[in-house]
């Protein structure tokens, strides 16, 4: 007999479609992930396997209630790894655009540079990470993806920084300096909801220095 199953994007799966029991929460309970003989293992010797996808741009800074729902939804899908992708994206007005929210981006572009965090955006980012971790969802963290360098960043490009600038972060001295600064601030900042920095959190599986570095 054919039966209609309703799956709502804002609600966790239920019944036989709820795969959250497959996750081993909280993320990080078995220690850091490491490689051994071509496979992934946790520090305690348990084999590590991951299933996940991207959360991009403005989706990295949901409000607290939405963050809870997203974590529940992902866990119910059996997802145990989320890529925090393009959290450095510039602000944009359209919800469907490849951009951060105007009021709560991770990076604060308001002062004509891209060198500090927006307090509200950072709080949302931290809370989202904490909710994912609680559900047993691990993290892949991107560094430079869509960062839009501003005049105040003092880039050494005549007429301003070119588009799709991430490719230049491989060899441009000023960009390397700015990206080191960003990485240190992002990875060493202590999340008040977990009590750990990303650098010290075993829920972080991988850190990607440069997105699509050959693009």
Predicted features along the sequence, with ranges:
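Active-site mouth of glycoside hydrolases
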Residues: 30-215
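N-terminal pre-domain segments of enzymes
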Residues: 1-30
């Amino acid at each position: 007999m054919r039966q209609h199953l309703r799956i709502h994007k804002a609600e966790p799966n239920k019944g036989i479609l709820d795969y959250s029991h497959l996750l081993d929460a909280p993320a990080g309970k078995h220690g850091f992930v490491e490689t051994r003989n071509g496979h992934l293992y946790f520090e305690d010797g348990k084999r590590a396997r991951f299933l996940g996808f991207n959360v991009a741009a403005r989706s990295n800074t949901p409000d607290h209630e939405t963050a809870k729902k997203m974590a529940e939804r992902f866990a119910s899908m059996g997802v145990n790894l989320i890529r925090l992708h393009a959290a450095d994206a510039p602000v944009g007005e359209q919800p469907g655009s490849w951009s951060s929210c105007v009021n709560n981006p991770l990076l604060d572009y308001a002062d004509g540079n891209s060198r500090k965090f927006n307090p509200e955006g950072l709080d949302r980012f931290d809370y989202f990470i904490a909710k994912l971790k609680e559900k047993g969802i691990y993290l892949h963290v991107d560094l430079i993806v869509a960062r839009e360098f501003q005049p105040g960043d003092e880039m050494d490009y005549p007429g301003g920084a070119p588009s799709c600038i991430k490719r230049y972060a491989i060899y441009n001295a000023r960009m390397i300096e700015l990206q080191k600064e960003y990485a240190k601030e992002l990875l060493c900042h202590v999340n008040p909801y977990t009590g750990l920095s990303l650098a010290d959190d075993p829920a972080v599986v991988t850190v990607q220095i440069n997105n699509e570095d050959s693009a």
